[in-house]
Amino acid sequence: SILILPAWLDVPEKFLTRKIIRLDPGSAFGTGSHPSTRLCIEALDNDPPLGQTIADLGCGSGILSITALKLGAHSTFSVDVDSLAISATKINSALNDFSENLLNVFLGSIEEIEANMPRKKIDLVLCNILAPVIKSIGPGFEKIIGHKGKVILSGLLVEQIEELKEFFLPLGWQVLEIKTKDQWALMVLNMDSP
């Protein structure tokens, strides 16, 4: 139900019924073509985040935050350590007509989300970054996630699935779902019984 278009193209008539995401990725990661990004978009499309508050860690171009909002999320808190990604996310947010109170963007990491979210609890964490970075910030997920909240991890290689399971299980996380595309994997976690 999602169509990702470069900002400068018109929507082809046969796709007018889809949710359109306009992007000008610049130099930030996230055009929608990478398998890890596609896995995340498919996960959001299959289980829309209606009314949820989202954290997008390593937001890149903002594509996952924008997708979540297009699919009914209440708001997003997006962070990246790259200032070019922050600029790209702000530009793409404006291209898709989202105000700053819907798509909140911060330079930094999980600490900025913790410091800036009014409800103090995120419903869904999107984390499409490489496995070593996921492991470095993973222990902080429970500081921002609410009861029954979920985490969608992507950006990991298929051969890293077991390593990440072994990392998160002792922290109290349970694996709800694993999907793969090419050599890339997506893992959905939560803190409660499925």
Segments from the language model and where they lie:
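Non-catalytic substrate-recognition/targeting regions of SAM-dependent transferases
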Residues: S1-G30
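Structural motif
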Residues: S1-L3, K19-I21, T53, S75, ...
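Structural signal for conserved beta-strand scaffold positions within catalytic alpha/beta enzyme cores
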Residues: I4-P6, R22, D56, L107, ...
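Hydrophobic residues in well-ordered beta-strands that form the structural core
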Residues: L5-P6, S78, L153
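Short, conserved glycine- and acidic-residue-centered signature motifs
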Residues: R22, F29, S33-T37, L130, ...
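Conserved SAM/SAH cofactor-binding pocket of Class I
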Residues: S27, T31-I110
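S-adenosylmethionine
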Residues: D47, V81-D192
